[in-house]
Amino acid sequence: MKVAIVGVSGAVGQEFLRVLDQRNFPMDELVLFGSSRSAGRVYTFRGKQYTVKELKHNDDFKGIDVAFVSAGGGTSKEFEKTITKHGTVMIDNSSAFRMDEDVPLVVPEVNPEDALNRPRGVIANPNCTTIQMVVALKAIENLSHIKRVHVSTYQAASGAGATAMAEDRKSVV
């Protein structure tokens, strides 16, 4: 399997690398993509060095089976067709596609079968607090039907990216 990570230089991109390694995700080839600022950086994965390629509108995704994308919603929207046009499955970590009816919103522990119906070649995932909640709710639902859930959450500043984190740090007295 040929795998790509888009946004590899960010915190989530680095977490993708860590989890893929930790879970011994089967892959024959890995391709890393990033912004013009990140292009040229080198990362080590499973003892091999990989150089980040600049994400561009070209055919770089031809032959790639799956792309894990975490480069912000604007980038996801802009590069959706570039990533999927040759059959690559785009697993997007941003909020860009969460409300699109033709993009499945998948939490593997809850609704993995929904990932099989992806007319646009894109799979989205919910917000991080939602993921944790629906995994727990699924276990309860399996025991007894849930009629209603009322939820309030506090969102982490990290979800808004590095700029928001820096702003948050400046605002703390």
Q: What do these predicted regions represent?
A:
Residues 1-171:
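N-terminal Rossmann-like NAD(P) cofactor-binding subdomain of oxidoreductases
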